Amino acid sequence: EFSKNPPQASSTRETDIGVYINTRNSKVIPIMEFEAKRFSETSNNQEYVYGERGGIERFKKGEHSKHLKECGMFAYVQSRTIEEWFSKVNGWVIYQSQNSINESIDWTEDEQLAKVSLLGSVEKFASCHKRNISNDTIFLWHYFIDLTP
């Protein structure tokens, strides 16, 4: 079962998509959640990584999917190329690792996205991030979807 904007335990933030298993006793168990962002000329593109609505940052802080160890993000590429956005995202991760003033988050260069596979107009990446709040890590799958004309 899929759900839009699943609620988060102990957070007012919501992810965009939740994937659940319905058990025989009607208990719903979340197994994966996804955050989605647009890459375009008019979006605040750095928020894929950090900022008030920062996708990766919310997973790192435990504002998204605190109860899960593996989740994902969708990037809707509406301008430029997937390769350009991949480079920019990794540049923003490096920037945060060298310049972050947020003491509740530790960024490292090891948190850059790594290429996994190309599936037609979708490129798949992976990253792993430290979560200070729970002293563990979260693994993220990243799907960059080419929507350019």
Q: Language-model segments: which ranges?
A:
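An N-terminal domain-start capping segment
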Residues: 21-23, 42-48
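Active-site metal-binding core of divalent-cation-utilizing nuclease and nuclease-like domains
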Residues: 1-30
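C-terminal tail/extension regions appended to the core domain(s) of diverse proteins
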Residues: 45-50, 62-70, 80-149
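Short acidic/polar capping segments at secondary-structure boundaries
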Residues: 39, 78-81
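Conserved catalytic cores of phosphodiester-cleaving nucleases, focusing on short active-site segments
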Residues: 17, 32-40, 59
